[in-house]
């Protein structure tokens, strides 16, 4: 089997996106995606009413999370932090190119400075091996199947998130009380305790063992994103944590002993209130920072926030409905997360071995 080696500049037209701001997207809203240097949400920055590219392309991120490669097929625009390749060689499959290039780009990312970069001049000189077009198409089709399955699983996850949001909005709204009386309470009036995390302890370790077994919690968007583990704990009761810095307003239910740090707010309600209900009520609360710059949610500010609360029986009923809906998508150990991770690892495994096989075919 003949293997041909080409530099990107020899088989592609190399372009770059243009300056498209969030303000521009807001003022020119439409149906055509704008791809950026982002790596989440398929790299989408937003949608506008015009497009700069139409057809099959390969894009890569030039700044920040530089070197992440995407296959594009459709009408779209790209920001100035997004490089765009248009294949001009009829013996090259664009999707195969995307898979091949994604294995190579990490080697060429320039990491000096605060933002990693991968510019057009560097990409132009990257060399890739290409088998006959028919083989390229078969490999691309095979690897694409893993991406398609992952996309289906992620769509199911989004569906579950929207389902929870719908029922949460409906059940927590006093307008849908169906005769049930809701009363407005300040958080300070329903709290048994409200505590704030201090500095990260000097005596801790990253890994959990029999001695260092209590998680150190701080401000994070992930429930299980721990700073490390401590020999001691401060909170032993069931509680609700609320991020007060950075990821302000990230709310999690905690049913284990832990040590809070870095101004994390810990809320323990009085026993006459259902903690599971209050968890969902606080998740629905829009917390705001105080002060300029990064700012923070202060203890005094937190205490003054208000929530509508029905009878204890109604609280229990609402919690019984919302709990399973929430934990279906929030639990990282749930099957769909494991399935997504498995498909990702499978694709990486076959991708690496298929392209190693191609390299081994070179004479």
UniProtKB/Swiss-Prot annotation:
Regulation: induction: Detected at low levels after 6 and 96 hours growth, there are fewer copies at 96 hours (at protein level).
Pfam families: Methylase_S (PF01420)
Biological process terms in GO annotation: DNA restriction-modification system
Gene Ontology MF terms: DNA binding
Record CDD domains: RMtype1_S_Fco49512ORF2615P-TRD2-CR2_like
Key words, A-Z: DNA-binding, Restriction system
Keyword Signal: no
InterPro entries per record: Restrct_endonuc_typeI_TRD, Restrct_endonuc_typeI_TRD_sf, Type-I_RS_S_subunit
The keyword DNA-binding appears for this protein: yes
Stretches assigned to coiled coil: none
Function of the molecule: The specificity (S) subunit of a type I methyltransferase (MTase); this subunit dictates DNA sequence specificity. The single R subunit has multiple frameshifts and is probably not expressed.
Oligomer status and interactors: The methyltransferase is composed of M and S polypeptides.
UniProt comment concerning the protein's domains: Contains two DNA recognition domains, each specifying recognition of one of the two defined components of the target sequence.
Recorded family membership: Belongs to the type-I restriction system S methylase family.
Name assigned to this protein: Putative type I specificity subunit S.MpnORF507P
């Amino acid at each position: 089997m003949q293997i041909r080696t080409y530099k990107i500049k020899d088989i592609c037209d190399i372009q770059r996106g243009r300056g498209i701001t969030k303000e521009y997207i807001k003022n020119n809203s439409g149906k055509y995606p704008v791809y950026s240097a982002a790596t989440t949400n398929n790299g989408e920055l937003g949608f506008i009413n015009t497009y700069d590219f139409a057809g099959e392309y390969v894009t890569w991120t030039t700044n920040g999370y530089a070197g992440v490669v995407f296959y594009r097929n459709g009408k779209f625009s790209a920001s100035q932090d997004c490089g765009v390749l248009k294949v001009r060689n009829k013996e090259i499959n664009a999707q195969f190119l995307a898979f091949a290039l994604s294995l190579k780009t990490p080697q060429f990312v320039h990491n000096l400075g605060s933002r990693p970069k991968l510019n057009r001049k560097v990409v132009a000189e990257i060399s890739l091996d290409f088998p006959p077009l028919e083989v390229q198409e078969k490999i691309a089709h095979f690897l694409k199947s893993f991406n398609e399955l992952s996309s289906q699983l992620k769509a199911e996850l989004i569906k579950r998130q929207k389902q929870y949001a719908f029922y949460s909005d409906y059940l927590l709204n006093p307008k849908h009380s169906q005769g049930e009386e809701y009363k407005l309470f300040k958080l300070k009036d329903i709290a048994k305790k409200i505590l704030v995390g201090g500095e990260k302890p000097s005596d801790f370790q990253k890994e959990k063992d029999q001695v260092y077994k209590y998680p150190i919690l701080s401000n994070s968007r992930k429930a299980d994103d721990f700073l490390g583990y401590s020999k001691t704990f401060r909170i032993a009761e069931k509680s609700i944590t609320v991020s007060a810095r950075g990821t302000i307003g990230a709310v999690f239910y905690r049913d284990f002993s832990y040590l809070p740090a870095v101004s994390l707010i810990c809320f323990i309600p009085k026993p006459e209130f259902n903690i599971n209900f209050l968890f969902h009520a606080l998740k629905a609360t829009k917390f705001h920072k105080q002060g300029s710059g990064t700012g923070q949610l202060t203890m005094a500010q937190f205490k003054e926030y208000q929530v509508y609360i029905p009878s204890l029986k109604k609280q229990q009923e609402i919690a019984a409905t919302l709990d399973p809906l929430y934990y279906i998508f929030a639990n990282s150990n749930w099957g769909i997360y494991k399935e997504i991770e498995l498909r990702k690892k499978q694709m990486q495994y076959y991708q690496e071995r298929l392209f190693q096989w191609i390299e081994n075919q070179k004479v």
